[in-house]
Amino acid sequence: MAIDKELQFTRNIGIMAHIDAGKTTTSERILFYTGLTHKIGEVHDGAATMDWMEQEQERGITITSAATTAFWNYNNQKYKINLIDTPGHVDFTVEVERSLRILDGAVAAFCAVGGVEPQSETVWRQAEKYNVPRIGYVNKMDRSGANFFEVVRQLREVLGANPCPIQIPIGAEETFKGVVDLVSMKALVWNDETMGAKYDVEDIPAELVGEAEEWRDKMLETLADCDDTLMEKYFDDPSTITEDEIIAALRKGTLAMQINPMLCGSSFKNKGVQTLLDAVCKFLPSPADTPTVEGTDPSDSSKVIERKTSPNEPLCALAFKIATDPYVGRLCFFRVYSGELPAGSYVYNARSEKKERISRLFQMHSNKQNPKEVIGCGDIGAGVGFKDIRTGDTLCDESHPIVLESMDFPDPVIGIAVEPKTQKDLDRLGVGLAKLAEEDPTFRVQTNEDSGQTVISGMGELHLDIIIDRLRREFKVECNQGRPQVSYKEAINDPVELREVYKKQTGGRGKFADIICRVEPADADFEGELQFVDEVKGGNIPKEFIPSIQKGFQRAMKNGVLAGYPLDQLKVTVIDGSFHPVDSDQLSFEICALQAFKNACEKAHPTLMEPIMKLEVVTPEESMGDVIGDLNKRRGQVEGMESSRTGARIVKAKVPLAEMFGYVTALRTITSGRATSTMTFSHYSEVPSTIAKQVLTEAQGRVDLIK
């Protein structure tokens, strides 16, 4: 019973938002008010506890997700809050994706001036994907142009959310001093002498009473839509609804993802953080609120297995991040869903089918470790001593294996060639890159077979800058960089049917395979890579050779016919063929499939595909013509223009990534430093033939195949 009670008072939450909405500052205030730090660290001073990497402190941005455990007293009850501070920059979305996979709830922070920005949209969609209940926190209410109600409107219109304000601000910009709590109908006013540690509960200022009553009525109306009992009371007599009933309805609506309670504050000015912590305890779910976790049987992926959130169930945990720590070596962060994990115990890795020993366990405070004897059910911790655990691995009990749904990570869109400056750097480079690739699934390392160059790929220029920086600082590797390269892909346009025969006679047993197949673009609704259809009748190709044909095409897709770029999707239908009772084997059919792929793609009108980015530029009105002119030169397509509340113009466009290198510097020049831009990956699109020919000439590819 005690364990269940402990679970009830545990919260696994993340703070997510657009870059610069104040996530890390909010986290720092939470650490201060929960007593974990005795001094507030400021992001702009490079002293934030959660931003522990040197690059984060220098750049004032969050790159990795720092995990911290804090405690908060609410309603005479001690709550344990596992807090994950995630990055807002688009190049680090993998960190957000990893965190949301293992969180029970999230605080979505918004800037009171900027409102719903591109990356806030991205993280909101990621939270929807993992069914993570959210409360909204409108930060920076002290800034010039702050408008809480406008942000609430944007949540409804841009994100399609159902925001439910449970506070309204008292004042705004420099006059912001507190909030009206619409549940208790009291004013909460912070005093600056105590660094915001205390606030006074007062009567609502006379000039705000009417507005507060109007917003309270809107809150009750929203709640009545989600709760039948409350609806009856609301229509009979709203004044009979008690505070406890409102809190219960808010919690119920949040957990069902029907509403998003909205709060406001100014973390930097120390106002509104305690009420945010109270709201986390009141409205966000505990591990006990998600009673079961679903996985599949490793030996039969169609068989669903459930685990109850209970310490008495067999162990089931998910590794969501691997990090290299200078003192303890490789750390694995994991969330325990059922059972418990004691230090020194063996766990079974469902992916590698091997046992791993976790020698020591820690609860993390940013990058400092507090040793633990056991990580219990519903908790988040970190372990060391393992050999082969990767992001997304399921750790379980060997006698009760289970595989939890892993995470999907986007493919990198940009690459650069790196080479060590000295022979001494060469050995270190390999080790450093391997460790960094292990930590970050969106970072890839490849060796170009023709040139022998090492090419590293990632989600954007900033992502690769940080990687190069970490190689220098953590692994003491100095390296030269080539210019950025776009991660092109290939595709085919036309269906091609052909017969491919592979024969080899070298004395003794030979090789033989014969395939008749149709190769074409995948169906529009197909989501995987290779859409493979077996239509062979009458055993003309024995069943045991069909997987080898499939494997051959899968291997072949990694290197297209134009310049060796991968194909994202392909449909292959094996229609017929023949085999030799002695000479045919699995390898023969695999090689035959590789050749069939090459010959078919050459005839199928292959095309080059390039990544297209979604760009949003906020610029003063007078620079707008220059910004649009520059985008047109970069093959951009302007999709819309809006006015922001601050009088600036917002230009939305789709632009090929190949044209966007160094864009930030160019934008600064044409707008005298007054414009800002955000860029996220949108989709892949066909490269115009004249440009495709230039790209293929540089890559020493098959220009002759471009029509």
From Swiss-Prot:
* UniProt GO MF annotations: GTP binding; GTPase activity; translation elongation factor activity
Q: Does the keyword Protein biosynthesis apply?
A: yes
The record's listing under Gene3D superfamilies reads: 3.30.230.10, 3.30.70.240, Elongation Factor G (Translational Gtpase), domain 3, P-loop containing nucleotide triphosphate hydrolases, Translation factors
User: Has keyword Cytoplasm?
Assistant: yes
Q: Which keywords appear in this protein's UniProt record, sorted alphabetically?
A: Cytoplasm, Elongation factor, GTP-binding, Nucleotide-binding, Protein biosynthesis
Q: Which InterPro entries match?
A: EFG_II, EFG_III, EFG_III/V, EFG_IV, EFG_V, EFG_V-like, EFTu-like_2, G_TR_CS
- Domain called tr-type G: residue spans: 8-288
The biological processes this protein is annotated with in GO are: ribosome disassembly
Compartment list: Cytoplasm
One GO cellular component term of this record is: cytoplasm
Which residues does the record give as GTP binding sites? 17-24, 85-89, 139-142
Q: What is its main location?
A: cytoplasm
UniProt-listed PANTHER family: RIBOSOME-RELEASING FACTOR 2, MITOCHONDRIAL, TRANSLATION ELONGATION FACTOR G-RELATED
- Which family is annotated? Belongs to the TRAFAC class translation factor GTPase superfamily. Classic translation factor GTPase family. EF-G/EF-2 subfamily.
**Function text:** Catalyzes the GTP-dependent ribosomal translocation step during translation elongation. During this step, the ribosome changes from the pre-translocational (PRE) to the post-translocational (POST) state as the newly formed A-site-bound peptidyl-tRNA and P-site-bound deacylated tRNA move to the P and E sites, respectively. Catalyzes the coordinated movement of the two tRNA molecules, the mRNA and conformational changes in the ribosome.
Q: What is this protein called?
A: Elongation factor G
What species was this sequence derived from?
Answer: Porphyromonas gingivalis (strain ATCC BAA-308 / W83)
